[in-house]
């Protein structure tokens, strides 16, 4: 029988936004592996489980721990914030699994920040959209610039992950400049959400020009509307294109 590793997307971090399938996988695991912040967010519900963690930038070691525990006959869960297949650990575990043919992997989907953040703001992704991370840790900034420019020229709505950090404090400002250079007007409707799904969640709707001057952190997801996105009752809304009835009729 194959050893089992669940790759679990835990959503924003609160139990209410974790799927029943994710909860079932965690309850059925002997060992839960993850970044310390994510393990802390799980709270006390799984305290009878064995928790293993590594700090940031030790993701490969974290995956090795999963295989080591699974090969001892334990059922293992690797937890990721949001969805494990969206800037998560799913692809790395699959790449490493070639050296561990006796381990069976199963991805458990979670609610990613693009979806949970969009819900908090209204309906900003109701048409074609793309997700772009501003982290240049593993992607050259020059390539990120090309993707931002292409999204702007294609009039996509955008969900921007990892908009800032201590070492990338000006990246959101640079992003807004790139978008304006490629046809996005300063008045474009935008928004952002900090600490999605947690007690101190904060949302703001603004223009691109206003967004350029905002200070955000690594727990923020930024939303850029397309040319038809508008603000309705304080919410960010991208029309799907339906023909509305004439209110005068």
Regions found by a protein language model. Give the residues of each.
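A contiguous loop/helix-start segment that scaffolds small-molecule binding in enzyme catalytic cores
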Residues: 5-7, 76, 153-249
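Short gly/pro/ser/thr-enriched loop/turn and capping motifs at secondary-structure boundaries
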Residues: 39-41, 59-60, 111-115, 137-140, ...
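Short gly/ser/thr-rich secondary-structure transition/capping motifs
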Residues: 11-17, 139-141, 204-206
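Fold-independent oxyanion-binding glycine-rich loops
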Residues: 10-14, 34-37, 54-56, 81-83, ...
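Class I SAM-dependent methyltransferase SAM-binding "motif I" and its flanking Rossmann-like core
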Residues: 86-154
């Amino acid at each position: 029988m194959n050893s089992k590793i669940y790759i679990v997307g835990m959503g924003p971090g609160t139990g209410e936004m974790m799927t029943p399938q994710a909860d079932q996988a965690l309850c059925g695991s002997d060992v839960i592996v993850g970044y310390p912040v994510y393990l802390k967010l799980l709270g006390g519900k799984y305290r009878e489980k064995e928790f293993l963690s590594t700090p940031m930038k030790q993701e490969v070691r974290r995956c090795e721990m999963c295989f080591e525990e699974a090969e001892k006959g334990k059922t293992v869960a690797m937890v990721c914030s949001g969805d494990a297949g969206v800037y998560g650990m799913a692809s790395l575990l699959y790449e490493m699994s070639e050296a561990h043919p006796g381990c069976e992997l199963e991805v458990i989907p979670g609610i990613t920040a693009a979806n949970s953040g969009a819900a908090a703001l209204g309906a900003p992704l109701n048409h074609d959209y793309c997700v772009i991370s501003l982290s240049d840790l593993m992607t050259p900034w020059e390539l990120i610039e090309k993707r931002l420019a292409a999204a702007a020229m294609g009039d996509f709505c955008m969900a921007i992950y990892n908009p800032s950090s201590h070492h990338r404090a000006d990246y959101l400002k640079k992003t807004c400049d790139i978008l304006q250079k490629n046809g996005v007007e300063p008045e474009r409707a935008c928004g952002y959400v900090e600490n999605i799904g947690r007690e101190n969640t904060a949302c703001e709707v603004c223009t691109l020009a206003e967004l350029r001057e905002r200070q955000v952190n690594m727990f923020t997801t930024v939303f850029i509307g397309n040319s038809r996105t508008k603000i309705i009752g304080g919410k960010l809304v991208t029309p799907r294109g339906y023909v509305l009835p004439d209110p005068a009729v």
